């Protein structure tokens, strides 16, 4: 079970049989994940391509790709940094800090130097060459430093390719959709990878490091899980079907996010909250939250016209509805008797029907009752009454624990309605006369 609905053509590249990325690999920094291989190739000419989605916004730099002492990283200020041991570091001007979006990274190296692209835009050019063979049999890592986990990347990765012997442009790996203007992935199966090239798709649960280039240049993986449940790191959140996450840019108070921005720990005596990245104003939608530590936590939906808070979030008027074991908090009226209490380990289903303006909460697949709400645009949300709580969310990027109610969909881009205007820039271009 994936998107629980027919994908929107808008997110299928606007053309027939558009290529779909099946899986991503979640990189949860605290787990010390590792993805690497030892091998040789043409150190003077090669191309690396991959897609990434940010997780926690760390203040230390994060490794994207490294071999020996040369590396491509996200700096502590969110700029890209290409580091050459002999010639120093080179930085992008732009900063990459949107945890809700997928970025396409391409690094092309030839005898003239190194070029780094993001979403088909050049961001770093250097006469220095990224050296894959600084030492014999150099180890190359994706998203992990060679030694400690301190500088590991945190987030998601997909479609990892290395082309041995060619310096390619981003158009070899992705293209501009003619209807939407989006930069979207291509099918890489027809590329010539070179004898030491590789293509990682993360679709084989028995071998996450499997090379699909035909070269059998498999990667070693460590500290990733494919077990069913919240710890599964093989997910359906991809560049062709972006899923809702808890947004680290839309929070207040003491909130710590991890596991691809799907797990939240809320601490402290002050009111805290974090909001999901998808807002919906029509249709029927469903997500689940595992109550890891119930504490003082609430889960539910928040209407996005709430721009400020004066006191605890669940006390606001006309815009929020939360379920806390045995109680319902709605529109500023707290502590209404609702449903049964829940304990650590229970799974809370949160269904919102914006066609009829209703919300239903479930405890371990048992309906706790349907409640009316006001119309508006709602986002998933969790908050606290001043204490602590821990929840793990699932917006559909892995299989739900329980089948959603009939007609309810996961919060992902494939399920969103088609936009009214395609290629909006064509309607807002500046005209001179």
Predicted regions mapped to residue ranges:
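Extracellular glycan-recognition modules
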Residues: 29-81, 113, 166-171, 280-281, ...
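Short hydrophobic/aromatic patches on beta-strands that form ligand-binding or substrate-lining surfaces
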Residues: 48-56, 105-107, 157-162, 200-201, ...
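Extended recognition patches within non-cytosolic domains
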Residues: 2-23, 30, 123-127, 156-241, ...
């Amino acid at each position: 079970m994936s998107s629980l609905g027919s994908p929107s053509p808008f997110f299928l590249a606007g053309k027939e049989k558009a290529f779909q990325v099946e899986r991503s690999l979640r990189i949860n920094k605290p787990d010390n994940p590792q993805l690497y291989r030892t091998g040789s190739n043409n150190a003077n000419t090669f191309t690396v391509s991959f897609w990434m989605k940010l997780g926690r916004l760390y203040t230390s730099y994060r490794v994207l790709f490294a071999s020996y002492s040369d590396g491509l990283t996200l700096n502590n200020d969110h700029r890209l940094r290409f580091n050459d041991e002999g010639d120093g570091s080179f930085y992008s001007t732009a900063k990459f800090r949107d945890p809700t979006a997928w970025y396409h990274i391409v690094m092309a190296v030839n005898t003239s130097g190194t070029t780094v692209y993001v979403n088909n835009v050049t961001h770093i050019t250097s006469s220095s060459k990224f050296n894959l063979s600084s030492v014999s049999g150099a180890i190359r890592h994706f998203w992990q430093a060679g030694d400690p986990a301190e500088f590991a990347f945190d987030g998601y990765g997909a479609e990892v390719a290395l082309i041995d012997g060619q310096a390619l442009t981003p158009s070899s790996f992705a293209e501009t959709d003619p209807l939407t203007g989006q930069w979207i992935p291509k099918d890489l199966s027809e590329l010539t990878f070179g004898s030491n090239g590789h293509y990682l798709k993360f679709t084989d649960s028995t071998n996450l490091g499997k090379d699909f280039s035909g070269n059998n240049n498999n990667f070693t993986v460590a500290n990733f899980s494919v077990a069913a449940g919240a710890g599964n790191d093989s997910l359906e959140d991809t560049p062709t079907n972006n899923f809702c996450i808890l947004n680290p840019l839309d929070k207040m108070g003491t909130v710590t996010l991890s596991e691809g921005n799907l797990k939240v720990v809320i601490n402290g005596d002050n009111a805290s909250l974090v909001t999901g990245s998808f807002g919906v104003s029509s249709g029927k939608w469903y997500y689940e939250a595992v109550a890891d530590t119930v504490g003082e936590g609430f889960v539910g939906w928040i209407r996005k016209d709430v721009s400020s808070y004066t006191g605890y979030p669940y006390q606001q008027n006309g815009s929020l509805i939360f379920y806390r074991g045995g109680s319902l908090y709605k529109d500023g009226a707290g502590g209404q008797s609702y449903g049964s209490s829940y304990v650590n380990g229970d799974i809370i289903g949160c269904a919102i029907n914006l066609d009829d303006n209703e919300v239903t909460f479930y405890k371990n697949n048992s309906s706790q009752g349907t409640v009316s709400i006001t119309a508006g645009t709602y986002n998933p949300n969790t908050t606290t009454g001043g204490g602590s709580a821990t929840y793990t969310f699932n917006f559909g990027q892995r299989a739900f624990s329980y089948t959603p109610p009939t007609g309810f969909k996961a919060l992902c881009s494939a399920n969103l309605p088609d936009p009214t205007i395609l290629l909006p820039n064509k309607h807002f271009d500046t005209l001179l006369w």
